[in-house]
Swiss-Prot record:
Family: Belongs to the ZIP2 family.
Intrachain S-S bonds: none
Originating species: Candida glabrata (strain ATCC 2001 / BCRC 20586 / JCM 3761 / NBRC 0622 / NRRL Y-65 / CBS 138) (Yeast)
Protein's cellular compartments: Nucleus; Chromosome
Any single GO BP term: chromosome segregation
Protein known as: Protein ZIP2
Domain of life where this protein originates: Eukaryota
Broad class of the protein's primary localization: nucleus
GO MF term (any one): DNA binding
One Gene Ontology term, aspect cellular component: nucleus
Chain's role: Required for initiation of meiotic chromosome synapsis. Involved in synaptonemal complex formation, a structure that tethers a pair of homologous chromosomes along their lengths and plays a central role in recombination and homolog segregation during meiosis.
Length: 676
């Protein structure tokens, strides 16, 4: 058999190798698998190109590039490579020889230097053989256990659906219309890099991410019961808060129509400390005073100073209750505006009826002596001087004018009845008349009849030494025995013994009437907190407001408080800003509280023991004053009968009881009451 010249002939092995005797060698399973794989490799067909020469170094470089396999996952046992240009097959003549001596041929190729294969190590020679398709690529198999999951976990299914998350750049708060503030977007550059990385559940799985511009917004539910107190509490403990912010006016942004677009100027709020305000030279009219207008008339320069008219602002004051006039009026010297502090609660004595009567007699005597002079109207206007314009008497009016004004007030205080209308005499007719005797008699008769018929509408009172003729009762609650005992002792020292002690489950010291109570607190306890964010008086006042229409809170302070802390008064007033709460400041160890209680507490001119006979309604936190009014309202029925009327929707007691009392009585009547 002749071999063609252009075909490659493998070298023959030496004969001594074939003469070796056969032996049975024990082989483990691992070597058996290796031998089986070698047998399969020996069965593969070597594919060589017809254009190849007898040596490897004569192969064209372009053909080598074509034959080189790509990195594809192909079964190395299979001899067919789909990426090659053509399949090179060895003729069947040399197939038997190659199948028997393939391993020795590869070893010979690695050692023989005539093929110009640079061999440095066995590992590099194997890599070169793999590149020339002489050896297939090895593949390692691993045992994989595939179990069917009958109950797939929810966590794994959710992990596959997790998208990339990012923190929002804006924070928007929705107050549901409680604040008329414009929402302003707050951008921050620090949040751009703070992005969460995606969680890779599988190696080859990628999810498409979609970013939207709709940023989330959070809603805040505001509790309407304590919203006012909690808001004032936050303002009170703000270190940067200043009183000037209470008087700031909201400025509106005007739209300007222009052809070119301009940037919007965001109006920001400003805050200044007290030290910065003192350092500022607050004189806005300083530049306006030095302003001058320059005009040219007949080629002459005339400098005329410009005048500016500044209209004062109109102040709208809130209405003040009549019970607080004696505390808030500046005439009594309670509030010192220059020092910004509160004074003593003790008011000065007002003009009494005795002083008015003395002024009346003086006026009548002067009218007798100067009657003829007043009838003569030939006096000139220039002979009189206005007392209010005299620099020595700017503070008060003339004494004669005061007496005339007081007489006018007394006359208007009495109602005009038909019987005394004929005897009335005006003050101007008295001054301009000649017959003074008859006029004096008419005035005396009118004054006496008015005293007998009616009483004046507004009478002056005097707190010190007031004679209490009515049998008025005051209820002392055993809420704080030490405090109530001190006040009751002061009341009894002033010869007031109508004090009744009761144990009512309400946090107040005294009950003054059916709709008002009294609470005495030290100024240091106003700013104390029971828990985080809850004040000491917040829970107490929320209970008293439900059971009473008016709550009088007396705050005791030491006299030295005005020196070292002046702002504590308006802070306490601000935190107790409620229409049902009346805040009054009194100094410690003073009789102002007892004087105020004696003036305010009045009830029907009867003793407390006589008017209250049944304490059935006290279980519903109804005070004895309300029980008395209920008995007066429904004399024919008993308190048990009153509960029956509530079942049928009777609204007779709406003006006496609060809504919480009526609801508690209705619940009791519907659940535990059986009609007979």
């Amino acid at each position: 058999m002749c071999i063609p010249e252009n075909m490659w002939t493998p070298p023959t092995l030496p004969l001594p190798l074939q003469s070796f005797p056969k032996e049975n060698i024990p082989i483990d399973k691992r070597t058996q698998k290796c031998l089986l794989q070698i047998k399969k490799l020996c069965s593969t067909q070597f594919s060589l190109n017809k254009e190849y020469k007898s040596t490897f170094n004569l192969i064209d470089y372009k053909l080598q590039r074509i034959i080189q396999p790509h990195n594809l996952s192909v079964n190395p046992i299979n001899s067919f490579w789909p990426h090659t240009v053509e399949r090179l097959v060895v003729p069947p003549i040399y197939y038997e020889m190659l199948s028997n001596q393939q391993i020795y041929t590869l070893d010979y190729l690695q050692i023989n230097p005539q093929y110009h294969i640079p061999i440095k190590s066995v590992q590099k020679s194997k890599q070169k053989a793999f590149q020339l398709n002489l050896l297939p690529l090895p593949r390692q198999k691993f045992r994989q256990i595939q179990l069917e999951s009958y109950m797939p976990s929810k966590l794994e299914s959710k992990m596959t659906s997790i998208c990339e998350e990012s923190l929002p750049k804006t924070v928007i708060f929705d107050y549901h219309g409680y604040f008329d503030l414009k929402q302003k977007l707050l951008t921050s550059n620090t949040l751009l890099t703070a992005r969460l990385n995606p969680i890779s559940t599988s190696a080859g799985c990628r999810q498409k991410l979609k970013f939207t511009t709709h940023w989330p917004s959070w809603t805040i539910e505001i509790n309407t019961d304590i919203s006012n107190i909690s808001r004032l509490h936050k303002v009170l403990f703000d270190e940067n808060f200043n009183k000037i912010e209470l008087f700031k006016l909201a400025s509106c942004n005007l739209k300007v129509e222009r052809s070119t677009r301009i940037k919007k100027n965001h109006i920001a709020t400003w805050k200044l400390d007290k030290l910065q305000l003192k350092e500022l030279d607050w004189d806005p009219l300083k530049k306006l005073k030095a302003y001058s207008v320059q005009k040219k008339i007949n080629c002459d320069e005339v400098h005329a100073q410009a005048t500016f008219i500044i209209t004062p602002l109109k102040l709208v004051l809130m209405p003040i209750n009549s019970s607080e006039i004696h505390i808030l009026q500046n005439n009594y010297g309670n509030i010192v505006i220059s020092a910004k502090s509160f004074g003593n609660l003790q008011p000065k004595n007002t003009i009494e009826s005795s002083q008015v009567s003395n002024n009346n007699t003086k006026l009548l005597k002067e009218a007798r002596t100067t009657g003829s002079s007043m009838s003569d109207r030939s006096t000139s206007i220039t002979s009189y001087k206005c007392s209010s314009l005299v620099p020595e008497k700017r503070s008060l009016l003339d004494s004669n004018l005061i007496s005339i004004v007081q007489l006018k007030k007394l006359r208007t205080s009495y109602p005009q009845s038909t019987e005394s209308h004929s005897g009335e005499m005006s003050l101007l007719r008295l001054l301009h008349s000649n017959s003074c005797k008859t006029e004096i008699q008419q005035i005396d008769t009118w004054y006496d009849t008015a005293k007998l018929n009616t009483t004046p509408k507004t009478t002056s009172f005097k707190l010190e030494g007031q004679d209490i003729k009515k049998k008025v009762s005051i209820i002392a609650n055993e809420y704080d025995i030490s405090t109530t005992y001190q006040i009751t002792r002061l009341l009894r020292e002033r010869q007031y013994s109508n004090i009744e002690e009761y144990r009512i489950k309400l946090p107040c010291h005294f009950i003054l009437s059916f709709s008002s109570c009294l609470l005495l607190v030290e100024i240091s306890k106003v700013f104390q907190c029971i828990t985080a964010g809850e004040l000491f008086l917040e829970r107490t006042l929320s209970i008293l407001i439900k059971h009473f229409r008016v709550v009088h809170v007396f705050i005791e302070y030491e006299p030295n408080t005005e020196l070292y802390d002046k702002d504590i008064f308006w802070k306490a007033k601000l935190i107790l800003n409620n229409p049902q709460v009346r805040t009054i400041f009194i100094p410690k160890f003073s009789n102002n509280l007892t004087t105020w209680m004696l003036r305010v507490t009045t009830i029907q001119g009867q003793k407390f023991q006589e008017m209250v006979k049944d304490n059935t309604l006290s279980h519903f936190n109804i005070n004895p004053y309300q029980e008395y009014l209920i008995q007066e309202k429904l004399r024919e029925s008993s308190p048990s009968r009153l509960i029956e009327t509530l079942v049928f929707g009777d609204h007779v007691l709406d003006g006496i009881l609060t809504p919480i009392h009526i609801n508690s009585l209705k619940i009791f009547a519907r659940e535990n009451w059986h009609l007979t």
